Amino acid sequence: MSHRQGDGADYVADEYETEELDDSDDSDGRDLYSSDSDIDDYMLRNLVYSTSKHDVYLMSHFSVIHWSSLTSTRTEVLNVSGHVAPREKHPGSLLEGFTHTQVSTLAVKDKLLVAGGFHGELICKHLDKPGVCFCSRTTCDDNAITNAIEIYNTASGVLHFIVSNNDSGVRDFDLENFQLSKHFRFPWPVNHTSVSPDGKLLIIVGDNPKGILVDSTSGTVVAPLRGHVDYSFASAWHPDGSTFATGNQDKTCRIWDIRNLSKSVTALKGNLGAIRSIQYTSDGRYMAMAEPADFIHVFDVKSGYEVEQEIDFFGEVSGVSFSPDTESLFIGVWDRTYGSLLEFGRRHNYSYLDTII
């Protein structure tokens, strides 16, 4: 594994140092990705979520696993290899549940986990309660892969989650009663949707070179996003709510400013493949973009994305996630030999005066 920085990288005081958790020894928690776990080429690699600098959730086989870096222990949270059925009754919930669900994406926030499947399945679970609370099939379409899920708080503080699906639909669910609140349809499969920090706008990207900015209430297109030349797989808002990023199969991540959408601010280039996942730190200082395999790029946003740390390893990327406090970066790696969960810690340089204070 190597970590390479671009010109001026010595200026970056806060880089990410790594601890590798792999299959190479028998100590607890080292086999987070064993050799028979499965990632298909068309999975969009959103299978790792951090809820604190010590807690991360990820897929291993047919299980959602919680890994604690504080205690070096792993705990199975949800197993979908057999039959899963909801314990609670909600309108629209499939009481018969699902059997042998292949999870394509997941999201975790505020003690709630939502997993999406290859056939439109949605499985919701409260992390502090046993069993599953809600099961639903979003679509019976033949092309029903659940591509991405994002859990967010509305302006009124209500918890919702939004689902991007290969049937060209974007669906918004209220998590208080697990009811569908909005359903927007588009002319192409939707690979990813991101909700703006104020909840008013959506970035919609999919099997079209042109992404769109959409009003979150009406689904009306606010502006097209022109610049990519292939299909897009990822998107993310900067916490400032004015800038955002889109990742594409053309091997670039484009940065946009809503105050001038006639062209992107810049295009950041990958090395070998599509940009499959994008994450900003909660303070907006850094942005990570993931390629399908071998490379994660961490950019210093404050430098205008000029300063980059390149993380180089062996294996396919199953997901990337910053912890909410920005102190940790987790990378899921699938490989028959080197499968692992990588944890990076943010490096801080403090002056003598800072130490006294």
Locate each region found by the language model.
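Loop/turn-rich, solvent-exposed surfaces of beta-rich toroidal or solenoidal domains
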Residues: G273-V298
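Beta-rich, blade/repeat-based domains predominating
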Residues: H192-T193, D230-P239, G273-S282, V317-P324
